[in-house]
């Protein structure tokens, strides 16, 4: 009986932790490269929702152009 209760307790704890982690996560976009908008621009991608249900957008990293040597 104790084993069953401990297994149920662990399962309950594991189901609560992701909810608490998402609740405690930072809900704002703090950076010069992140902005809350209704739609991301072509050079941005969505990260998360902001507090007012806008989308937190982050600028994509640019890939360096490779020169062909031959």
Swiss-Prot record:
A Pfam entry, by short name: Defensin_beta_2
Keyword DNA-binding in annotation: no
Disulfide bond residue pairs: 29-57, 36-50
Subcellular location, principal: secreted
Signal peptide (from-to): 1-22
Keywords: Antibiotic, Antimicrobial, Defensin, Disulfide bond, Secreted, Signal
GO biological process terms, semicolon-separated: defense response to bacterium; innate immune response
Listed GO CC annotations: extracellular space
Organism superkingdom: Eukaryota
Compartments (UniProt record): Secreted
Keyword Signal: yes
Family: Belongs to the beta-defensin family.
Protein's recorded name: Beta-defensin 43
Organism from which the protein derives: Rattus norvegicus
Lineage, uppermost ranks: Eukaryota, Metazoa, Chordata, Craniata, Vertebrata
Gene transcribed to yield this protein: Defb43
């Amino acid at each position: 009986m104790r084993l069953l209760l401990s297994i149920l307790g662990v399962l309950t704890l594991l189901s609560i932790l992701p909810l608490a982690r998402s609740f405690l996560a930072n809900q704002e976009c703090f950076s010069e490269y992140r902005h809350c908008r209704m739609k991301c621009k072509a050079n941005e991608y969505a990260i998360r929702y902001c507090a007012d249900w806008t989308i937190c957008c982050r600028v994509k990293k640019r890939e360096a152009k490779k020169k062909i040597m031959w």
